[in-house]
């Protein structure tokens, strides 16, 4: 009978040990599953962050390229000098000056904008020239500067050399033929204009 009881106790203990083993296995499995889930969540979070960073970098690169292209286009539109190496802020300031200059020219009605292409481009060259000379009178960034705005007659006395490899950068020279064909009073007037820094 004792043997029978002992075998019962032993088998009962085995069952207890087995149930403890089963529980510990289940706990280990659950821990492993939760660890796997955490690792999986961590990996997916890392992948999301990397993807988000890559997309943000692409957007920033595209924004920078668009901005640079816009500034490049603006530099081609505004008259510049061969010596200009303009930063972005200087380009914006120069564009603002050019807009102000054009506003004054339009207000005074100094340039006749004809519908003919040849006249339009001639007027555009004269405006570019006048702006560049106006810009060189005194301090480039001075607010209280009193600028001379050219009359159409003064603009007509100028000749332009456009250098294609420099975009819209103009190299200027005085209208020699205009000086040669003018009478002495006109020459004196042109020389005075040169001395005053208008051309």
Swiss-Prot record:
SUPFAM superfamilies xref list: HLH, helix-loop-helix DNA-binding domain
GO cellular component: nucleus
GO MF term list: DNA-binding transcription factor activity, RNA polymerase II-specific; protein dimerization activity; RNA polymerase II transcription regulatory region sequence-specific DNA binding
Compartmental location: Nucleus
Compositional bias of kind Basic and acidic residues: 25-39
Function field: Probable transcription factor, which may be responsible for the formation of myoepithelial cells in early muscle development in larva and the formation of non-muscle tissues in later bud stages and mesoderm-like structures in the medusa.
Name this protein carries in UniProt: Twist-related protein
Source organism of the structure: Podocoryna carnea
Gene that specifies this protein: TWIST
């Amino acid at each position: 009978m004792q043997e029978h009881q002992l075998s019962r106790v032993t088998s009962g203990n085995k069952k207890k040990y087995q149930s403890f083993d089963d529980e510990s296995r289940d706990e280990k499995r659950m821990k492993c599953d939760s660890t796997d889930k955490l690792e999986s969540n961590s990996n997916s979070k890392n992948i999301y962050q990397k993807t988000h960073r890559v997309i943000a970098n692409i957007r920033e690169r595209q924004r920078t390229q668009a901005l640079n292209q816009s500034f490049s286009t603006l530099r081609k539109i505004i008259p510049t000098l061969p010596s200009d190496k303009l930063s972005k802020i200087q380009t914006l300031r120069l564009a603002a000056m050019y807009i102000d200059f054009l506003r004054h020219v339009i207000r005074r009605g100094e340039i006749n904008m004809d519908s003919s292409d040849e006249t339009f481009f001639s007027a555009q060259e004269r405006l570019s020239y006048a702006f560049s000379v106006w810009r060189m009178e005194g301090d480039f960034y001075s607010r209280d500067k009193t600028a001379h705005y050219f009359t159409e007659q003064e603009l007509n006395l100028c000749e332009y050399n456009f250098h294609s490899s420099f975009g819209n950068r103009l190299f200027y020279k005085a209208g020699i033929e205009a000086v040669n064909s003018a009478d002495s009073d006109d020459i004196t007037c042109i020389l005075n204009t040169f001395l005053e820094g208008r051309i």
